[in-house]
């Protein structure tokens, strides 16, 4: 976990790859989250809705990105986490998570950093999720 003295604006951890995301991963996440929309597990349903195949629940990637961020800066230190869903993740995709410190400051007696986060699809380079978070840093 990165500490206050190690971090500067522009600091970034090593990118991390996750996957390939399998249909089993997708169904497991659906079971854990209670989101059973058939577009994420029923091939015929997804195709009838105009998609080439089933695709991952966006919150799966949001969880992967959150795990990346908390591995970097500590789960107990999260003060804010927000994401925007940009692009579907398909079975077999590998996603790559990255982050950058955008602001380092003191507020309310605590050291804090704001970070931009990104989860991209390795195959296309497209952003699956863009995120932002605030962490307290000891």
Task: Annotate each language-model stretch with its function.
Residues 1-15, 88-138:
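HotDog/MaoC-like acyl-thioester-processing domains
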Residues 1-77:
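Hot-dog-fold acyl-thioester-processing enzymes
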């Amino acid at each position: 976990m990165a500490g206050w003295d190690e971090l500067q604006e522009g600091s970034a951890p090593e990118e991390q790859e996750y996957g390939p995301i399998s249909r089993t991963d997708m169904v497991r996440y659906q079971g854990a989250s209670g989101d059973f929309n058939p577009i994420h597990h029923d091939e015929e349903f997804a195709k009838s809705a105009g998609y080439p195949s089933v695709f991952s629940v966006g919150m799966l990637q949001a969880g992967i990105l959150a795990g990346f961020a908390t591995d970097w800066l500590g789960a107990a230190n999260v003060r804010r986490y927000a994401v925007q869903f940009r692009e579907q993740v398909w079975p077999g995709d590998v996603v790559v998570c990255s982050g950058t410190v955008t602001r380092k400051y003191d507020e309310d007696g605590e050291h804090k950093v704001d970070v931009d986060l990104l989860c991209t699809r390795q195959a296309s380079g497209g952003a699956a999720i863009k995120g932002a978070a605030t962490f307290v840093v000891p």
